[in-house]
């Protein structure tokens, strides 16, 4: 995992706001158990490109794992709004299922 993290970080030096690379890096940090860095990169993605819908599901799941249910619910709600606006019903349904599992 560490080797992949280093490779992605090297790519990010050229384009630090690349959503795909930041998302990939966040997922690698999740695999490595580094939730603080994973969260930082998911949140960076949300700030850089709020329409990058994949971020919402994974950040929500991370927040659930660290016991921040209210924040996870808010992230799922925002993600559902974004997915609906993008007409991305697959992502919307995934976010809605995660939201309902947590909220009800």
Ranges and model annotations:
Residues 10-11, 44-45, 79:
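Canonical positions in the second alpha-helix
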């Amino acid at each position: 995992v560490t080797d992949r993290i280093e490779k992605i970080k090297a790519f990010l030096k050229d384009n630090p706001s690349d959503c795909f690379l930041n998302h990939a890096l966040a997922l690698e940090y999740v695999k490595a158990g580094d939730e603080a860095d994973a969260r930082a990169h998911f949140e960076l993605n949300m700030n850089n490109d709020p329409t990058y819908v994949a971020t919402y599901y994974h950040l929500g799941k991370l927040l659930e794992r660290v016991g921040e249910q209210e924040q996870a619910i808010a992230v799922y709600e925002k993600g559902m709004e974004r997915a609906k606006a993008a007409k991305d019903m697959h992502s919307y349904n995934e976010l809605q299922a995660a939201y309902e599992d947590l909220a009800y």
